[in-house]
Amino acid sequence: DARARSFVARAAAEYDLPLVGNKAPDFAAEAVFDQEFINVKLSDYIGKKYVILFFYPLDFTFVCPTEITAFSDRHEEFEKINTEILGVSVDSVFSHLAWVQTERKSGGLGDLKYPLVSDVTKSISKSFGVLIPDQGIALRGLFIIDKEGVIQHSTINNLGIGRSVDETLRTLQALQYVKKPDEVCPAGWKPGEKSMKPDPKGSKEYFAAI
């Protein structure tokens, strides 16, 4: 979409975008979870859990349910490594609830294992730099936020491109692994594979072993 591409090109100049390595913008909003309305505040997770925060354009669309249900189906894997998932769109909680109450075979979500946050004011999408102003919807932004509330990873896809749960999980596992002192993860690293020390000797040892 040309308008989305134009937005991305000028976004850095128009917004104070959250950067990897900086604190995530806090927010408080209504959400739907377990077919109930709840309140969610991002800072409530500080000191407790990692957060996968992902934005999607709209409820009752086409690519969006494939992503949302894929994350729900793999929720237990994220839960095991102390991580919560939050989905966000500019829809109301009433729209979220109706979508959750619609069966998957009819284009709905069915029961989800994590909250869907309502960003009707568009303030959350704007604060994370994913809002397309002239369309009033969010690009497919995904942010991994650590237990200190710091953004450790971000990706933004255009509207027609879904995201990979496998790659999100792999990246999260790598981020948690490198919390160990003096360890870094090479390309495509997965748990159980060899990492390296971030110095000339360590890199030589790594390359000699592969």
UniProtKB/Swiss-Prot annotation:
Transit peptide (residue range): 1-10
Tissue-by-tissue expression: Expressed in leaf blade, sheath, basiplast, stem and green spike. Maximal expression in young developing shoots segments where cell division and elongation take place. Not expressed in roots.
EC numbers on record: 1.11.1.24
Protein name as annotated: 2-Cys peroxiredoxin BAS1, chloroplastic
GO biological process, alphabetically ordered: cell redox homeostasis; cellular response to stress; hydrogen peroxide catabolic process; response to oxidative stress
Highest taxon in the source lineage: Eukaryota
Main location: plastid
Pfam families the UniProt entry points to: 1-cysPrx_C, AhpC-TSA
Subcellular compartments: Plastid, Chloroplast
One GO CC term on file: chloroplast
Signal sequence residues: none
Role noted for this protein: Thiol-specific peroxidase that catalyzes the reduction of hydrogen peroxide and organic hydroperoxides to water and alcohols, respectively. Plays a role in cell protection against oxidative stress by detoxifying peroxides. May be an antioxidant enzyme particularly in the developing shoot and photosynthesizing leaf.
Reactions catalysed: a hydroperoxide + [thioredoxin]-dithiol = an alcohol + [thioredoxin]-disulfide + H2O
SUPFAM superfamilies the record matches: Thioredoxin-like (SSF52833)
